[in-house]
Every structure is written in C-alpha cells, then in structure tokens.
Amino acid sequence: MTKPIVVTGTDTGIGKTVFAAALAGALDAFYWKPVQAGIEDETDRQAVLRLSGLPDARLLPEAYRLNTPASPHLAAEIDGVTIDAEALALPEIDGPLVVEGAGGLLVPLTRAITYIDIFARWRAPVVLCARTTLGTINHTLLSIEALRARAIPLLGVAFIGDENVESERVIVQIGRVPRLGRLPRLVEVTADALRAAFAQNFNTDDFLKDPAS
C-alpha cells in the first residue's frame, strides 16, 4: 500500500530537494518528482539519487521532463508539451513514497491548475519546507492558510537554514502547526553529511503520524 508524503515549499530555491533526499533516505522510501522543468544541469531526481543513498530503482521517472528551466506551465508551452494535470496520479507503491512538488504551492502546472489543486485531489499528507531568513513568517503562514483552506492534511513545517528561534516559534504558535525540525546549512552537501544532519535534527516517527488538523 502506498504511503505518500508530499514535500512542498514556501518558495523556490530554499533547499526542498535536499530535504526530500534526506527524508526519502531516512524512510528508505521511493521518490517521485511529477514534473521536472530544466534538465540541462543536475535534475532533482539526480540530486536525490546522489544525496539519499537510495538505489536508482527507488527513484521513479518523472511524468514530464521539460527542457526549459521555468514554471512548468511556461516550460511546457515553450517545449510544445501538453501537461495533463488531471491525469497526474500518485504511483501505486508498496511502502513509503516521497513526492516533491516544484517551488511553492501556487506554482502553475497549466494555465488553469496549480500544484495545490493536485495536492488537494491527492489528499496526501504534506510537509511544508520553510526557510529561516527574513520574510519567512509571512510566506509560511500564508502557505499554511492555503493548505488548510483546501483541507489538505499538514504533517508540519520543516525549517531549512540557520537557526532563527523567534521566527520558528511564531510560525508554530500562530500557524498551530508542528515543528518537525530544522535542517541546518551544511558546509559540504554530501550523502553522509545530510544523513547525519537529518538524524540529529528530525525524528522519522513524526513523519508517520496522523497529520495535524
């Protein structure tokens, strides 16, 4: 039976893929990125393969691989590809599955459908990755509100970056959401360093609990 966890973020470039790699490795899970936009450099799937310690067979192929590094809706239009967002379904996997979105919740897959629309249909529990720098309180609380408005189950917030006790505390208090932990900035991002940092700062049992309401 598939046990999916959706990893999304408050913004792009905050370390969501690195976190997804750490989580997938810690849970000995499968990993899936439904849409990859931009394949010239290392793709997210390739990064997770490098950092998670998982065998290649655990990393499922993307539903769409787009050449252009842009929002999926625009990348698809430039590449001449039609994304059938309504047909995107969670793979049938026997065991845990980490699914990574792109950027934030309202990143468009098409001109009519955003990632949060897909997450609402899937009803899979979500981990919200948030940075710790200036502006994160507003971005994170808005993302929490958006998830709750669509009745999407939220496991909690995973902070990424340098310690910011006050911002983290305010988000947890006002957002009424569990703090899952904080992945610190790593001097060198390797599989071993990431595995150790995740084990020190997160409890894998927290990702297997029933989501907060």
UniProtKB/Swiss-Prot annotation:
CDD domains tied to this protein: DTBS
Binding site for Mg(2+): T17, E100
Residues reported to bind ATP: G13, I14, G15, K16, T17, V18, E100, G101, A102, G103, P184, R185, L186
Keyword Protease: no
Record's keyword annotation contains Ribosomal protein: no
Subcellular localization, as worded in the UniProt entry: Cytoplasm
One annotated GO molecular function: ATP binding
Pathway it works in: Cofactor biosynthesis; biotin biosynthesis; biotin from 7,8-diaminononanoate: step 1/2
EC number: 6.3.3.3
GO cellular component terms attached to this protein's record: cytosol
Cofactors required: Mg(2+)
Catalytic residues as annotated in Swiss-Prot or TrEMBL: K33
Keyword field: ATP-binding, Biotin biosynthesis, Cytoplasm, Ligase, Magnesium, Metal-binding, Nucleotide-binding
Disulfide bond entries: none
First-listed, main subcellular location of the protein, grouped into a coarse class: cytoplasm
Function: Catalyzes a mechanistically unusual reaction, the ATP-dependent insertion of CO2 between the N7 and N8 nitrogen atoms of 7,8-diaminopelargonic acid (DAPA, also called 7,8-diammoniononanoate) to form a ureido ring.
Quaternary data: Homodimer.
Family: Belongs to the dethiobiotin synthetase family.
Name the UniProt record assigns to this protein: ATP-dependent dethiobiotin synthetase BioD
Species the sequence originates in: Rhodopseudomonas palustris (strain HaA2)
Species lineage: Bacteria, Pseudomonadati, Pseudomonadota, Alphaproteobacteria, Hyphomicrobiales
The gene coding this protein: bioD
